């Protein structure tokens, strides 16, 4: 028996299934009591809007209401205007859907749902009434009322019975990220790096990180306090820096071990103390222990005159990179504690860097535009086929094609998900036919109807809580509710049922085939484009810009990295290459930030470094692959380092130190494992980059 119950959903999932079913029946009963023409819309809306958590339910309710209202108003406006020219009406509907879909792709939070829904609500309302345009107002009004009813019931019932907050789930995700990040950092600190393990941990950290943005957007909808929401955003803004900071530290330590083994002994006690401190921060991160570790690190930092020696510069750079990681980790842990305790006290950062700023999402507008265009063209082609075939109920095929293309437009490879949509919709037709022709004829009152729905709907609703079942179960329950088309009186005709409801799977099958033809690229194309965007941004750094523009670009590059790494892993490419390219850009940004503070030969050489790095990546763009770093660039880096050490800049201690560390970091990112070299060492073979 224990084995049997092991696979059963937990009690809280069953509570959610019962609660959602009860809400759907309440919405259905009220809609029938008010004699609404399509009460099943209210029932289906409950399942669409509901979530196990208060925040997502509230936000989906709000944004679904906004999207439905906008789409209904568009239908009332466009249908009477273009009903005499059906082909033009089709183009207008397709453009409306595509434009709003394109706008929704710019948003990565829950509010994108409002725009996407407004886009496909127009065909949902407009296409069924093209033969009777005078009914468009009635249909738009009825759909709006019934959906608003379903939204209201779902929100009220969800808030009153067994409400769950999203905050504990957010805490669990943060703990998962920290568990991976702790092991990841520990492997590099102890110099026990296993490539497969590190790659797996990196992938887990990125996947967890990418789920946090949507959750952060939901927290205000369940009443999270403003300071807590600010802290979650600060935490995410620091999490995104950890991977490049650890990668830079690893390269600095590797170069130290390879070039100056005599200095490794001085570094070892600090690494051991840092590893011990890392383990101690699992439950708390007191500032006093962080300060003691920082003091130990600062005591090892060479003085300004010693940096003329490149071995001492290597040592100093390794200390600087370790200090960055220590400060960043302290901030992350202190923010985690503040979020968990819901502290409303102002939070104080210890990791301070000019590049820290508000997260700016990177958007590949080219792919977004193409995705919207493929949706527009799918709607137009499907509509033309419907008109030419003269299929009375073919509008349902166009509607579901529009819905499917919109739902999965943001995916690199939407075809498999559209096929799942098709499969579960086809199953819903089968389930609806069983109910409509075998079960409902034997029912004579509403309580019997509730009992007939109870077992399968509660079971399926319970399974929607689990991510692996969510899409299939939600489609099954929503489509079955819609296809049964429950109204005030039983009126079922098999031919009418088959004609109207088989159109949906046909439309989805068309959307699947169309997507295979129009979007066969998958993650490979997205990864390739993201690589080229990175190179273009590095080339663009040779152009004049303000510090604020550079800060925005740096944060945007970090966001792009979080999109790039999963795609590289999915296509079997080395994720370390993308990290190095990001570090090239970040070190260039540091050079550009501090270069205006120096004059003369050092300034000329710093400008030359930036220009030559830009030329190098311009050559990579032209070649279509990452080329070996040219020897001339490496010599320029070495000359610049010597100029900073020999032009009387020792008085500009902080500026000089930042520039030297940026040069060292840039060199290591371009050529891992090697530091500043003389001309005699430039004959050594340089590592090839990953082909584009």
State where each predicted segment sits.
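A transmembrane helix-and-boundary motif of multi-pass membrane transporters/channels
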Residues: 1-228, 334, 338-341, 345, ...
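Soluble C-terminal extramembrane regulatory/interaction domains of multi-pass membrane proteins
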Residues: 177-181, 185-188, 235-353, 590-692
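Extended, charge-rich low-complexity regions and/or helical-solenoid scaffolds
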Residues: 519, 523, 544-633
């Amino acid at each position: 028996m224990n084995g049997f119950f092991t696979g059963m959903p937990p009690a809280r999932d069953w509570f959610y299934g019962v609660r959602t079913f009860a809400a759907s029946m309440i919405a259905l009963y009220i809609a029938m009591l008010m004699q609404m023409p399509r009460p099943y819309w209210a029932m289906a809306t409950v399942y669409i809007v509901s979530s196990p958590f208060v925040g997502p339910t509230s936000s989906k309710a709000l944004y679904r209401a906004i999207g439905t209202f906008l789409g209904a108003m568009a239908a009332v406006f466009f249908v009477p205007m273009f009903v005499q020219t059906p082909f033009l009406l089709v183009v207008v509907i397709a453009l409306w859907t595509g434009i709003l879909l394109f706008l929704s792709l710019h948003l990565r939070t829950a509010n994108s749902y409002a725009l996407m829904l407004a886009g496909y609500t127009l065909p949902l309302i407009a296409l069924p009434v093209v033969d009777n345009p005078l009914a468009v107002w009635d249909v738009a009004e009825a759909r709006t009322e019934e959906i608003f009813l379903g939204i209201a019931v779902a929100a009220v019932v969800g808030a009153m019975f067994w409400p769950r907050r999203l905050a504990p789930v957010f805490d669990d995700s943060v703990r998962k990220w920290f568990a991976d990040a702790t092991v990841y950092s520990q492997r590099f600190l102890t110099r026990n790096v296993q490539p497969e393990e590190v790659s797996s941990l990196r992938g887990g950290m990125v996947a967890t990180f990418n789920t946090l943005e949507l959750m952060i957007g939901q927290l205000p909808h369940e009443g999270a306090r403003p300071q807590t929401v600010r802290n979650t955003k600060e935490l995410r803004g620091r999490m995104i820096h950890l991977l490049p900071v650890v990668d830079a530290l690893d390269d600095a330590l590797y170069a130290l071990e390879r070039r100056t083994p005599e200095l490794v002994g001085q570094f070892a006690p600090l690494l051991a103390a840092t590893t011990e401190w890392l383990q101690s921060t699992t439950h708390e991160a007191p500032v006093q222990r962080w300060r003691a570790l920082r003091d130990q690190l600062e005591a090892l930092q060479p003085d300004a005159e010693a940096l003329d020696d490149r071995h001492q510069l290597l040592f100093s750079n390794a200390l600087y990179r370790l200090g960055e990681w220590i400060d960043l980790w302290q901030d992350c842990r202190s923010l985690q504690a503040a979020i968990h305790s819901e502290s409303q006290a102002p939070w104080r950062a210890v990791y301070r860097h000019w590049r820290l700023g508000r997260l700016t999402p990177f958007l590949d507008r080219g792919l977004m535009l193409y995705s919207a265009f493929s949706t527009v063209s799918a709607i137009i082609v499907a509509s033309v086929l419907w008109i030419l075939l003269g299929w009375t109920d073919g509008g349902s095929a166009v509607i579901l094609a529009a819905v499917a293309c919109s739902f999965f437009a943001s995916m690199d490879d939407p075809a498999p998900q559209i096929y799942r949509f098709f499969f579960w919709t086809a199953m819903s037709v089968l389930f609806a036919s069983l109910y409509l022709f075998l079960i409902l004829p034997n029912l004579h009152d509403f309580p019997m109807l509730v009992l007939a729905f109870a077992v399968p709907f509660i079971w399926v609703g319970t399974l929607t809580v689990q991510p692996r079942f969510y899409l299939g179960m939600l489609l099954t329950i929503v489509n079955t509710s819609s296809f049964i088309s429950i109204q005030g009186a039983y009126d079922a005709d098999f031919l009418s049922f088959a004609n109207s409801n088989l159109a949906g799977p046909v439309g989805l099958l068309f959307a699947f085939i169309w997507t295979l033809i129009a979007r066969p690229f998958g993650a490979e194309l997205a990864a390739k484009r993201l690589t080229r965007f990175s190179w273009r941004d590095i080339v663009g750094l040779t152009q004049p810009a303000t510090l604020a523009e550079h800060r925005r670009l740096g944060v945007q590059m970090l966001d792009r990295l979080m999109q790039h790494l999963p795609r590289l892993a999915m296509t079997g490419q080395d994720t370390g290459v993308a990290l190095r390219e990001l570090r090239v850009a970040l070190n260039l940004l540091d050079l550009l930030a501090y270069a205006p503070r120096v004059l003369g030969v050092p300034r000329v050489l710093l400008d030359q470094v930036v220009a030559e790095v830009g030329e190098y990546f311009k050559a990579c763009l032209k070649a279509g692959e990452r080329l070996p770093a040219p020897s001339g660039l490496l010599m320029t880096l070495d000359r610049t380092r010597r100029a900073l050490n020999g032009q009387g800049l020792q008085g500009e201690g902080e500026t000089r130190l930042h520039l030297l560390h940026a040069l060292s970091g840039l060199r290591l990112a371009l050529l891992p494992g090697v530091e500043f070299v003389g001309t005699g060492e430039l004959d050594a073979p340089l590592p090839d980059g990953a082909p584009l």
